[in-house]
Amino acid sequence: MDFGFTDDQREIQRTARDLLAGRATPARVREHAEARTIDAPLWHELSELGWAGIAVAEQYGGQGLGQIELSILCEELGRALAPVPFLPSAMAATVIEHGGSPALCERWLPGLASGESIGALGAAVDGAAELVIGAPDAQVIVLVEGDGSARVLAAEEAELTPIESIDPTRSAASVSAAGAGEELPDGCAGLGRALVSVSSELVGVCDRALSMTVDYVKDRKQFGVPVGSFQAVSHRCAQMLLETEQARSTAAFAAWTADADPERLAEAAAMAKAAASDAGREVTAAAIQMHGGIGFTWEADVHWLFKRGQLDAALLGGAGRHRARIAAILADRAGAPALG
Protein backbone atom coordinates (compact mmCIF):
# COMPACT_ATOMS: atom_id res chain seq x y z
CA MET A 1 0.00 0.00 0.00
CA ASP A 2 1.48 3.32 -1.12
CA PHE A 3 -0.35 6.58 -0.42
CA GLY A 4 2.01 8.51 -2.67
CA PHE A 5 0.51 9.63 -5.96
CA THR A 6 1.89 8.38 -9.25
CA ASP A 7 3.27 10.89 -11.73
CA ASP A 8 -0.01 10.80 -13.66
CA GLN A 9 -2.05 11.39 -10.51
CA ARG A 10 0.15 14.31 -9.49
CA GLU A 11 -0.35 15.77 -12.96
CA ILE A 12 -4.13 15.46 -12.59
CA GLN A 13 -3.92 17.24 -9.25
CA ARG A 14 -1.66 20.01 -10.56
CA THR A 15 -3.74 20.57 -13.67
CA ALA A 16 -6.97 20.68 -11.70
CA ARG A 17 -5.62 23.13 -9.12
CA ASP A 18 -4.14 25.45 -11.75
CA LEU A 19 -7.29 25.42 -13.89
CA LEU A 20 -9.65 26.05 -10.98
CA ALA A 21 -7.47 28.85 -9.63
CA GLY A 22 -8.28 30.78 -12.78
CA ARG A 23 -11.82 29.55 -13.50
CA ALA A 24 -13.35 29.24 -10.02
CA THR A 25 -12.16 32.48 -8.47
CA PRO A 26 -13.83 33.71 -5.26
CA ALA A 27 -15.60 36.43 -7.25
CA ARG A 28 -16.99 33.90 -9.73
CA VAL A 29 -18.08 31.53 -6.97
CA ARG A 30 -19.80 34.40 -5.19
CA GLU A 31 -21.55 35.48 -8.39
CA HIS A 32 -23.09 32.06 -8.97
CA ALA A 33 -23.81 31.47 -5.28
CA GLU A 34 -25.75 34.69 -4.96
CA ALA A 35 -27.69 33.86 -8.13
CA ARG A 36 -27.99 30.18 -7.07
CA THR A 37 -26.91 28.99 -10.51
CA ILE A 38 -24.34 26.48 -11.70
CA ASP A 39 -21.39 27.73 -13.72
CA ALA A 40 -22.46 26.21 -17.05
CA PRO A 41 -19.37 27.34 -19.04
CA LEU A 42 -17.05 25.86 -16.42
CA TRP A 43 -19.04 22.61 -16.32
CA HIS A 44 -18.81 22.38 -20.11
CA GLU A 45 -15.06 22.96 -19.98
CA LEU A 46 -14.53 20.32 -17.30
CA SER A 47 -16.66 17.86 -19.25
CA GLU A 48 -14.62 18.52 -22.40
CA LEU A 49 -11.52 17.64 -20.39
CA GLY A 50 -13.08 14.30 -19.44
CA TRP A 51 -13.56 15.09 -15.77
CA ALA A 52 -17.23 14.09 -15.68
CA GLY A 53 -16.36 10.53 -16.67
CA ILE A 54 -12.96 10.15 -15.07
CA ALA A 55 -13.94 7.00 -13.15
CA VAL A 56 -16.54 5.69 -15.62
CA ALA A 57 -15.52 2.63 -17.62
CA GLU A 58 -14.23 3.27 -21.13
CA GLN A 59 -16.96 1.09 -22.63
CA TYR A 60 -19.46 3.72 -21.47
CA GLY A 61 -17.44 6.66 -22.75
CA GLY A 62 -15.47 7.41 -19.59
CA GLN A 63 -11.76 7.65 -18.86
CA GLY A 64 -11.66 4.31 -17.05
CA LEU A 65 -9.55 5.55 -14.14
CA GLY A 66 -10.11 4.73 -10.48
CA GLN A 67 -11.45 6.14 -7.25
CA ILE A 68 -8.10 7.73 -6.41
CA GLU A 69 -8.22 9.92 -9.51
CA LEU A 70 -11.87 10.74 -8.86
CA SER A 71 -11.04 11.67 -5.27
CA ILE A 72 -8.26 13.97 -6.44
CA LEU A 73 -10.76 15.95 -8.51
CA CYS A 74 -13.32 15.97 -5.70
CA GLU A 75 -10.74 17.41 -3.32
CA GLU A 76 -9.63 20.12 -5.74
CA LEU A 77 -13.21 21.10 -6.62
CA GLY A 78 -14.03 21.23 -2.91
CA ARG A 79 -11.04 23.44 -2.26
CA ALA A 80 -12.17 25.82 -5.01
CA LEU A 81 -15.89 25.58 -4.11
CA ALA A 82 -16.51 25.37 -7.85
CA PRO A 83 -20.26 25.86 -8.52
CA VAL A 84 -20.59 22.84 -10.80
CA PRO A 85 -22.57 19.60 -10.30
CA PHE A 86 -19.48 17.39 -10.33
CA LEU A 87 -19.91 15.64 -6.96
CA PRO A 88 -23.60 14.67 -7.22
CA SER A 89 -23.19 13.58 -10.83
CA ALA A 90 -20.07 11.53 -10.07
CA MET A 91 -21.75 9.85 -7.10
CA ALA A 92 -24.78 8.93 -9.19
CA ALA A 93 -22.58 7.52 -11.95
CA THR A 94 -20.59 5.49 -9.43
CA VAL A 95 -23.65 3.87 -7.87
CA ILE A 96 -25.19 3.10 -11.27
CA GLU A 97 -21.99 1.61 -12.69
CA HIS A 98 -21.15 -0.58 -9.72
CA GLY A 99 -24.67 -1.61 -8.77
CA GLY A 100 -26.74 -1.34 -11.93
CA SER A 101 -27.66 -3.77 -14.65
CA PRO A 102 -25.95 -3.57 -18.06
CA ALA A 103 -29.12 -2.01 -19.45
CA LEU A 104 -29.14 0.73 -16.81
CA CYS A 105 -25.46 1.42 -17.39
CA GLU A 106 -25.98 1.66 -21.15
CA ARG A 107 -28.90 4.01 -20.64
CA TRP A 108 -27.33 6.50 -18.27
CA LEU A 109 -23.53 6.27 -18.10
CA PRO A 110 -22.60 7.61 -21.56
CA GLY A 111 -24.47 10.86 -20.89
CA LEU A 112 -23.05 11.18 -17.38
CA ALA A 113 -19.52 10.46 -18.61
CA SER A 114 -19.74 13.14 -21.30
CA GLY A 115 -21.30 15.72 -18.98
CA GLU A 116 -24.31 16.07 -21.28
CA SER A 117 -26.43 14.58 -18.51
CA ILE A 118 -26.21 15.49 -14.84
CA GLY A 119 -26.86 13.04 -12.04
CA ALA A 120 -27.90 13.43 -8.43
CA LEU A 121 -27.84 11.08 -5.47
CA GLY A 122 -29.60 11.27 -2.13
CA ALA A 123 -30.37 9.25 1.00
CA ALA A 124 -34.03 8.24 1.09
CA VAL A 125 -36.57 6.70 3.43
CA ASP A 126 -39.34 4.73 1.74
CA GLY A 127 -38.56 6.32 -1.61
CA ALA A 128 -38.47 9.93 -0.40
CA ALA A 129 -35.40 12.10 0.22
CA GLU A 130 -35.60 15.42 2.04
CA LEU A 131 -32.41 16.82 0.49
CA VAL A 132 -30.83 15.82 -2.82
CA ILE A 133 -28.11 18.20 -3.99
CA GLY A 134 -28.09 18.86 -7.70
CA ALA A 135 -31.56 17.39 -8.24
CA PRO A 136 -33.07 20.50 -9.92
CA ASP A 137 -30.35 20.36 -12.60
CA ALA A 138 -30.29 16.57 -12.99
CA GLN A 139 -31.57 14.26 -15.69
CA VAL A 140 -31.15 11.12 -13.56
CA ILE A 141 -31.59 10.70 -9.81
CA VAL A 142 -30.44 7.83 -7.60
CA LEU A 143 -32.14 7.32 -4.23
CA VAL A 144 -30.36 5.08 -1.71
CA GLU A 145 -32.26 3.60 1.24
CA GLY A 146 -30.81 2.90 4.67
CA ASP A 147 -30.74 -0.84 3.96
CA GLY A 148 -28.53 -0.26 0.92
CA SER A 149 -31.22 -0.74 -1.70
CA ALA A 150 -31.37 1.91 -4.39
CA ARG A 151 -33.65 3.15 -7.14
CA VAL A 152 -32.72 4.97 -10.35
CA LEU A 153 -35.22 7.22 -12.05
CA ALA A 154 -35.32 9.88 -14.71
CA ALA A 155 -35.80 13.35 -13.26
CA GLU A 156 -39.16 13.77 -14.99
CA GLU A 157 -40.43 10.64 -13.22
CA ALA A 158 -39.71 12.06 -9.78
CA GLU A 159 -41.70 14.46 -7.66
CA LEU A 160 -39.29 17.36 -7.06
CA THR A 161 -39.73 20.29 -4.73
CA PRO A 162 -36.83 22.77 -5.05
CA ILE A 163 -35.46 23.95 -1.71
CA GLU A 164 -32.75 26.33 -0.54
CA SER A 165 -30.04 24.50 1.34
CA ILE A 166 -27.45 26.09 3.61
CA ASP A 167 -24.99 26.03 0.68
CA PRO A 168 -26.09 28.40 -2.10
CA THR A 169 -23.35 27.16 -4.42
CA ARG A 170 -25.51 24.07 -5.01
CA SER A 171 -29.08 23.55 -6.11
CA ALA A 172 -31.16 21.15 -4.03
CA ALA A 173 -34.60 19.62 -3.87
CA SER A 174 -36.66 17.15 -1.91
CA VAL A 175 -37.40 14.13 -4.09
CA SER A 176 -40.02 11.40 -4.01
CA ALA A 177 -39.79 8.39 -6.29
CA ALA A 178 -43.48 7.58 -5.81
CA GLY A 179 -42.80 4.05 -7.04
CA ALA A 180 -41.22 5.22 -10.29
CA GLY A 181 -37.86 4.21 -11.69
CA GLU A 182 -35.96 0.95 -11.51
CA GLU A 183 -34.38 -0.90 -8.61
CA LEU A 184 -30.63 -1.39 -8.71
CA PRO A 185 -29.61 -5.06 -8.42
CA ASP A 186 -26.92 -4.09 -5.88
CA GLY A 187 -27.37 -0.63 -4.42
CA CYS A 188 -24.58 -1.07 -1.87
CA ALA A 189 -21.90 -1.78 -4.46
CA GLY A 190 -21.23 1.85 -5.37
CA LEU A 191 -22.35 3.54 -2.17
CA GLY A 192 -18.96 3.16 -0.51
CA ARG A 193 -17.31 4.94 -3.43
CA ALA A 194 -19.86 7.74 -3.22
CA LEU A 195 -19.00 8.17 0.47
CA VAL A 196 -15.30 8.35 -0.41
CA SER A 197 -16.01 11.05 -2.99
CA VAL A 198 -17.88 13.33 -0.60
CA SER A 199 -15.22 12.69 2.07
CA SER A 200 -12.53 13.77 -0.38
CA GLU A 201 -14.42 16.95 -1.20
CA LEU A 202 -14.59 17.71 2.53
CA VAL A 203 -10.81 17.34 2.73
CA GLY A 204 -10.46 20.06 0.11
CA VAL A 205 -12.92 22.32 1.93
CA CYS A 206 -11.10 21.88 5.23
CA ASP A 207 -7.68 22.39 3.68
CA ARG A 208 -8.78 25.67 2.11
CA ALA A 209 -10.41 26.84 5.36
CA LEU A 210 -7.22 26.06 7.26
CA SER A 211 -5.05 27.85 4.71
CA MET A 212 -7.22 30.96 4.74
CA THR A 213 -7.28 31.00 8.53
CA VAL A 214 -3.52 30.65 8.93
CA ASP A 215 -2.94 33.44 6.41
CA TYR A 216 -5.39 35.67 8.26
CA VAL A 217 -4.00 35.16 11.77
CA LYS A 218 -0.47 35.81 10.49
CA ASP A 219 -1.55 39.17 9.05
CA ARG A 220 -4.14 40.34 11.60
CA LYS A 221 -2.44 42.24 14.42
CA GLN A 222 -3.57 43.00 17.95
CA PHE A 223 -1.47 44.65 20.66
CA GLY A 224 1.17 45.21 18.00
CA VAL A 225 1.72 41.53 17.15
CA PRO A 226 0.05 38.99 14.84
CA VAL A 227 -2.85 37.29 16.61
CA GLY A 228 -1.41 33.98 15.43
CA SER A 229 1.41 34.42 17.92
CA PHE A 230 -1.03 34.00 20.81
CA GLN A 231 -1.00 30.48 22.20
CA ALA A 232 -4.77 30.04 22.18
CA VAL A 233 -4.91 30.95 18.49
CA SER A 234 -1.93 28.84 17.43
CA HIS A 235 -3.26 25.84 19.34
CA ARG A 236 -6.64 26.17 17.63
CA CYS A 237 -4.93 26.26 14.24
CA ALA A 238 -2.94 23.17 15.19
CA GLN A 239 -6.17 21.39 16.09
CA MET A 240 -7.65 22.38 12.73
CA LEU A 241 -4.59 20.86 11.05
CA LEU A 242 -4.93 17.61 13.01
CA GLU A 243 -8.59 17.26 12.08
CA THR A 244 -7.89 18.01 8.43
CA GLU A 245 -5.04 15.51 8.22
CA GLN A 246 -7.08 12.81 9.93
CA ALA A 247 -9.80 13.32 7.32
CA ARG A 248 -7.19 13.30 4.55
CA SER A 249 -5.59 10.06 5.74
CA THR A 250 -8.85 8.15 6.12
CA ALA A 251 -10.15 9.42 2.77
CA ALA A 252 -6.89 8.44 1.05
CA PHE A 253 -7.03 4.98 2.59
CA ALA A 254 -10.65 4.54 1.53
CA ALA A 255 -9.88 5.64 -2.04
CA TRP A 256 -7.01 3.17 -2.20
CA THR A 257 -9.24 0.45 -0.74
CA ALA A 258 -11.92 1.07 -3.38
CA ASP A 259 -9.40 0.29 -6.12
CA ALA A 260 -7.17 -2.30 -4.44
CA ASP A 261 -9.25 -4.12 -1.80
CA PRO A 262 -12.98 -3.49 -2.40
CA GLU A 263 -14.00 -6.19 0.09
CA ARG A 264 -12.92 -3.80 2.87
CA LEU A 265 -14.47 -0.70 1.32
CA ALA A 266 -17.61 -0.56 3.49
CA GLU A 267 -15.53 -0.20 6.65
CA ALA A 268 -12.96 2.15 5.11
CA ALA A 269 -15.64 4.39 3.58
CA ALA A 270 -17.49 4.65 6.90
CA MET A 271 -14.25 5.60 8.64
CA ALA A 272 -13.54 8.23 6.00
CA LYS A 273 -16.99 9.79 6.16
CA ALA A 274 -17.03 9.85 9.97
CA ALA A 275 -13.66 11.61 10.10
CA ALA A 276 -14.47 13.96 7.23
CA SER A 277 -17.87 14.91 8.67
CA ASP A 278 -16.28 15.78 12.00
CA ALA A 279 -13.56 17.80 10.29
CA GLY A 280 -16.00 19.53 7.96
CA ARG A 281 -18.08 20.78 10.85
CA GLU A 282 -15.28 21.64 13.26
CA VAL A 283 -12.63 23.08 10.93
CA THR A 284 -14.97 25.39 9.02
CA ALA A 285 -16.64 26.57 12.24
CA ALA A 286 -13.22 27.28 13.74
CA ALA A 287 -12.26 29.20 10.60
CA ILE A 288 -15.24 31.51 11.09
CA GLN A 289 -14.33 32.11 14.73
CA MET A 290 -10.63 32.64 14.04
CA HIS A 291 -11.49 35.34 11.51
CA GLY A 292 -13.16 37.25 14.33
CA GLY A 293 -15.93 39.71 13.56
CA ILE A 294 -15.12 39.84 9.85
CA GLY A 295 -15.73 36.09 9.61
CA PHE A 296 -19.43 36.67 10.23
CA THR A 297 -19.82 39.19 7.41
CA TRP A 298 -21.28 38.44 3.98
CA GLU A 299 -18.20 39.99 2.33
CA ALA A 300 -15.80 37.46 3.89
CA ASP A 301 -15.30 34.45 1.62
CA VAL A 302 -14.75 32.06 4.53
CA HIS A 303 -18.49 31.65 5.11
CA TRP A 304 -18.87 29.85 1.77
CA LEU A 305 -16.50 27.18 3.09
CA PHE A 306 -18.48 26.92 6.31
CA LYS A 307 -21.71 26.35 4.39
CA ARG A 308 -20.19 23.73 2.10
CA GLY A 309 -18.56 21.98 5.05
CA GLN A 310 -21.77 21.82 7.07
CA LEU A 311 -23.78 20.50 4.12
CA ASP A 312 -21.24 17.89 3.02
CA ALA A 313 -20.89 16.69 6.62
CA ALA A 314 -24.55 15.66 6.59
CA LEU A 315 -24.67 14.16 3.08
CA LEU A 316 -25.33 10.41 3.10
CA GLY A 317 -25.20 10.43 6.89
CA GLY A 318 -23.16 12.25 9.48
CA ALA A 319 -20.34 11.06 11.72
CA GLY A 320 -22.61 9.33 14.24
CA ARG A 321 -24.32 7.22 11.61
CA HIS A 322 -21.04 6.04 10.15
CA ARG A 323 -19.49 5.27 13.53
CA ALA A 324 -22.51 3.08 14.19
CA ARG A 325 -21.87 1.41 10.84
CA ILE A 326 -18.24 0.76 11.80
CA ALA A 327 -19.37 -0.73 15.12
CA ALA A 328 -21.81 -3.03 13.32
CA ILE A 329 -19.11 -4.20 10.90
CA LEU A 330 -16.65 -4.91 13.72
CA ALA A 331 -19.30 -6.65 15.82
CA ASP A 332 -20.25 -8.84 12.89
CA ARG A 333 -16.62 -9.70 12.29
CA ALA A 334 -16.20 -10.68 15.94
CA GLY A 335 -19.47 -12.61 16.00
CA ALA A 336 -20.92 -10.30 18.64
CA PRO A 337 -24.29 -8.50 18.58
CA ALA A 338 -24.10 -4.87 17.46
CA LEU A 339 -25.09 -2.22 19.97
CA GLY A 340 -28.31 -0.32 19.37
Each predicted region: which residue ranges?
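Short, flexible active-site-proximal loops enriched in glycine and acidic residues
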Residues: 80-88
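A short linear-motif detector with a strong N-terminal bias
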Residues: 31-33, 74-75, 97-101, 121-123, ...
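Helix-loop "lid/cap" segments that line or gate small-molecule binding pockets
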Residues: 91-100, 328
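FAD-binding core of flavoproteins
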Residues: 82, 94, 102-215, 225, ...
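Alpha-helical interface subdomain recognition
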Residues: 1-80, 115, 192-340
